[in-house]
Every structure is written in structure tokens, then in C-alpha cells.
Curated annotation (Swiss-Prot):
It comes from Gluconobacter oxydans (strain 621H). Homodimer. Pfam families: HGTP_anticodon (PF03129), tRNA-synt_2b (PF00587). It is found in: Cytoplasm. PANTHER family: MITOCHONDRIAL RIBOSOME PROTEIN L39/PROLYL-TRNA LIGASE FAMILY MEMBER (PTHR42753), PROLINE--TRNA LIGASE (PTHR42753:SF2). The gene is proS. This is Proline--tRNA ligase. One of its GO terms (molecular function) is ATP binding. Its EC number is 6.1.1.15.
Length: 438
């Protein structure tokens, strides 16, 4: 994308309403614009980040056999009355009526709808297990929306649901999903620590939340450093083998990790001092096992091996996709702007032409840009070099390819790595190879 053609409305001034770094930087960098209290429009660069996160989630969910569906944002109130949650959920649920006076709601979650869909289609234990997921916008009417997309009223979420014939099968599904989540977060460039959690209004008796470490996190966290040091991407786990999943799960649960709500000083004292880690965390994911809570309350049955009907066991698994954008920025920024992990950055690199209309500079920039115009941002504006440097740092592109007249004459460019500030003088070919665009 050429910056002269891009819709990239950056702000020079810090918005007064923005209280935390991610909110300030998302507004300043032109990723989002607020349209109402707690509701944001996603602009092109921000949408590219969302799509990159979605793609990683899809790849990892598909890898464990989950299948993608897409459910509507509006749900029938009758489904929620069947589960008993319509009146219990509280004022966070946005309730509406259509022109015929039928009660609807803007879904804050999808347990009821997916259970109804499953129950209308699956009739035998032979069709189990099943895992379904979707990525959809949701709405919760927060009393005090704040911190930008971190606590908005409308948000993009990936939620998945598993259905199993037994408790043992459901626990295997739960562990499989935990591994998928840990792989997702590592690929996104953040370290999310899994911690035992309350089940809240979802219900159930087994739950973990995943928290990204950041100074502005809502929760105090206490955990064993071993959890932060794990390489989940290289861990060999057979997701179809219950014993392999149990071994993996033990590597998580054998190490202490808790938020302030669940913190146990006696257990914390058992962690060696050199492995103790304390800080604050932002919740970006939550997984639940709740047995037959919804299948029983909604009358969903399948036939077992002996022909007798039974209620399948369920799990529910959520990732805050739009919240992750804010969490990644909170965990990875500096005074100059965002520092995107390469896997989610809106563009692989920014090409900074320091001398517009210089024949050598233009030729090199055009050559580099032509290798991958979809994933390179070419700053071809007639602006001062300082403006281009500042905007590139603000936007947080992993690499900056700086093309000036002196280097251009020698066929050289300067390559700057945003995360470290390191600079390299390289040939065009070597620069492209280093950023992975060759």
C-alpha cells in the first residue's frame, strides 16, 4: 500500500479521553475511531491486525479438529429462557423486540444457540465428539466502558464449544483446547499464562483464564516462571491421545499460577524464590468445562451405545480477538509508539523514501515495493524525514527500510528493526531476505 493512497488518519495530539497506552496509540495511529460510548469503528490498519489474529486462531483451531461456523449476532430470547439465563444474566445483556413484539437479544455469548443447533442435528454417540467455533461480534452493556477496546461494549470474540459423550472425553477436549490457546498466544507474540479461574455466569466446575502480562492489567498475578519459559509450539502432543494430553496438562497445572482472587499464600510459599514472578495481567482468554448444564436444561439428548438417551458434556472456550489488539500493545510499546510482533503487524515493513523525486531513491523504493505490495507500506509522501520516522515508529511496523540518496547510489538501504532499534546497512537483496519478503 502506498501511504499517499492509504486511509491512515494519524493524530499528533494525545486524545484526552484515552487513559492507557493502547487506547492512546490505537487512536493516534489511526487503527480505530470511537463512534459511541464503548463502540469503535476499525480502520484499515487496525482491521488488518484483527484479520491477522483471526487467521492464526483459525489455523490452530482447525489443527485440533474444531470446525468453523458463523452464528448470528441476534438471538431469540426463548433459547435463553430454556436455559434459565435470560433473567439471570443481568443488565449487561442488550434486550430488544422486533416489530412483532418478539423478544430478542444481542448475544453476549453463544452457549444456548450452539446447544440448540447441535441438538437439532446430532442424535447418536457415534457422532461425538464435536468441536465448533466461530468468530463474531458481541455486545455487553458495560456500566462504565473504558480503556478503549480493552473494555468496550461491542467486541470481537472467538468462542468454541465442545460436545462429548463422557466426562473423560470432555476433559480431553478441554485439555486439547488449552494447548491450542497456548499455541495461539505464543504465535501472536505474547506470553499468556493460564490460571485457575471462577466460572462466573457461564457455570461449570473447571475453568482457566489466560492473562497477558502488562503493567496496566486489571488483575494481580502470581506464577511460577516455568510457565513463562515453556515453548508450546515445539511441544510434541498427540491431540488424539488422552494420555499425551494428560501429560501436557500436568506441565501446566503442576506449576503455581493464580490471580489475586485465587491466590494462596501457603502454596505460593512452596515456589522457589528464584522462580517466583509477580505482576499484573490482562485476561485475553477463558475456557470452561460445565458438564451437562446446558444440554440438560435445554433438553438436548443423544442415544448411547445401549440405545438409552443421555445429555452430552460440554465445554466453552473464548478468546477476546479485539481485546487482544489492545493487550498486545500494552505488552509491547515504547514512548515512540507500538511495537508489533511480526505475526500480527498490519504490514511486514515500512519503506521510507527520504528523497522523493530522486531517481535512485525512487527506483529502489519501487523495486522493493514491487516484491510484496500487499504487505509492504510505502511512505511516498512529500514529508520531512523526521515526520516519516515518527509515523513509522508510531505505527510499529517490525522493520523500516530507509532509502536515502547516498545509499541509493551504492544500491544500499538502511534497515531498522523496530523492537530493538538496531540498524543495518544492506543491499536490497539482503534487506528483503532479512525481513522475509524476498
Amino acid at each position: 500500500m502506498r501511504l499517499t493512497k492509504a486511509f491512515q488518519p494519524t493524530l499528533k495530539e494525545v486524545p484526552a479521553e484515552a487513559q492507557i497506552a493502547s487506547h492512546r496509540l490505537m487512536l493516534r495511529a489511526g487503527l480505530v475511531r470511537q463512534t459511541a460510548s464503548g463502540i469503535y469503528a476499525w480502520l484499515p490498519a487496525g482491521l488488518r491486525v484483527l484479520r491477522n489474529i483471526e487467521q492464526i486462531i483459525r489455523e490452530e483451531q482447525d489443527a485440533i479438529g474444531a470446525q468453523e461456523v458463523l452464528m448470528p449476532t441476534l438471538q431469540s430470547a426463548e433459547l435463553w429462557r430454556r436455559s434459565g439465563r435470560y433473567d439471570a444474566y443481568g443488565p449487561e445483556m442488550l434486550r430488544i423486540q422486533d416489530r412483532h413484539g418478539r423478544d430478542l437479544l444481542y448475544g453476549p455469548t453463544n452457549e444456548e444457540m450452539i446447544t440448540d443447533i447441535f441438538g437439532s442435528s446430532v442424535k447418536s454417540y457415534k457422532e461425538l465428539p464435536k468441536a465448533l467455533y466461530h468468530i463474531q461480534w458481541k455486545f455487553r452493556d458495560e456500566v462504565r466502558p473504558r480503556f478503549g477496546v480493552m473494555r468496550g461494549r461491542e467486541f470481537l470474540m472467538k468462542d468454541a464449544y465442545s460436545f462429548d459423550a463422557s466426562y473423560e472425553g470432555a476433559v480431553a477436549s478441554y485439555r486439547r483446547m488449552m494447548l491450542s490457546y497456548l499455541r495461539i498466544f505464543q504465535r501472536l507474540g505474547v506470553r499468556a499464562v493460564p490460571m485457575v479461574a471462577d466460572t462466573g455466569p457461564i457455570g461449570g466446575d473447571l475453568s482457566h483464564e489466560f492473562l497477558v502480562l502488562a503493567p496496566t492489567g486489571e488483575s494481580a498475578v502470581f506464577f511460577d516462571a516455568a510457565l513463562e519459559e515453556q515453548d508450546w509450539l515445539s511441544r510434541p502432543v498427540d491431540c488424539d491421545d488422552a494420555e499425551s494430553l494428560a501429560t501436557f496438562f500436568a506441565t501446566v497445572t503442576d506449576h503455581y499460577a493464580a490471580t489475586d482472587e485465587k491466590h494462596d499464600e501457603a502454596e505460593w510459599a512452596k515456589v522457589p524464590a528464584e522462580r517466583k514472578r509477580e505482576g499484573r495481567g490482562i485476561e485475553v482468554g477463558h475456557i470452561f468445562y460445565f458438564g451437562t448444564k446446558y444440554t440438560a436444561s435445554m433438553g438436548i439428548e443423544v442415544s448411547g451405545p445401549d440405545g438409552a438417551p443421555f445429555h452430552p458434556h460440554m465445554g466453552s472456550y473464548g478468546v477476546g480477538v479485539s481485546r487482544l489488539v489492545g493487550a498486545i500493545i500494552e505488552a509491547s510499546h515504547d514512548d515512540a509508539g507500538i511495537i508489533w510482533p511480526a505475526s500480527v503487524a498490519p504490514y511486514r515493513a515500512a519503506i521510507l523514501n527520504l528523497r522523493q523525486d530522486d531517481e535512485a531513491c525512487d527506483a529502489i523504493c519501487d523495486r522493493i515495493y514491487g516484491t510484496d505490495p500487499e504487505n509492504l507500506l510505502y511512505d511516498d509522501r512529500s514529508e520531512r524525514a523526521g515526520v516519516k520516522f515518527n509515523d513509522a515508529d508510531l505505527m510499529g511496523h517490525p522493520w523500516q527500510i530507509i532509502v536515502g540518496p547516498r545509499g541509493a547510489k551504492e544500491g544500499k538501504v538502511e534497515l531498522k528493526q523496530r523492537a530493538t532499534g538496531e540498524r543495518f546497512e544492506l543491499s536490497v537483496e539482503d534487506a528483503l531476505a532479512k525481513i522475509g519478503a524476498a
